[in-house]
C-alpha cells in the first residue's frame, strides 16, 4: 500500500490531499500542486486527468517544489501507485518498430543509452518483468514514461512523441 500527500503551496504548505490508491481525477481535491510528500510506494503523477500528459516518477521522499520532480508546472491532475515488484527486471529494446533490428536485453538501470549502447533511439520494446521508467535525456532527466510489463510496438505506444531515449531505470522503492 502506498501513501502520497499533495500540497497546493511550496514547502508542504496550503491545502493538502492525502491519497493511497490510483486517482484518475485529482481536480476536485486541489487546484494546483507545488509540493509532494511520498510516505510509501512509488508513484507516477500526470499533468492531466485520466493519466494523460507529462508523467513524473516519484519514490519515497519529500519534494518541496515541483521542480524537484522535474515538473514543468504546478498542474497534477491524476496519479497511480506503481505495483511493487520483488523479482528480477527484464526488458528488450529494439532499434526499429515492431521488434525489428538490433535487440538488447536489459536487466539493470542505464544512466546513458548513448554511452552504453551507442544509439539514442528506441523504436520498440518488450517489458518482460518489472516496471521501468524511460527518460528522454541522459541522467534520468527530461520527459518520463512509465512502462509496465507488455509489448510496445512503437514509441507512440508508451506515449512519446518521438523515439529519443536518453536513460531508463527500474521502478524500485530504493536506489
Swiss-Prot record:
Residues 84-88 are annotated as: Connecting peptide. Keywords: Eye lens protein, Repeat. It holds the Pfam family Crystall. One of its GO terms (biological process) is eye development. One of its GO terms (molecular function) is structural constituent of eye lens. Residues 2-40, 41-83, 89-129, 130-172 form the Beta/gamma crystallin 'Greek key' domain. It comes from the Eukaryota. One of its GO terms (cellular component) is cytoplasm. Has a two-domain beta-structure, folded into four very similar Greek key motifs. Belongs to the beta/gamma-crystallin family. Crystallins are the dominant structural components of the vertebrate eye lens. There are six different gamma crystallins identified in mouse lens. This is Gamma-crystallin B.
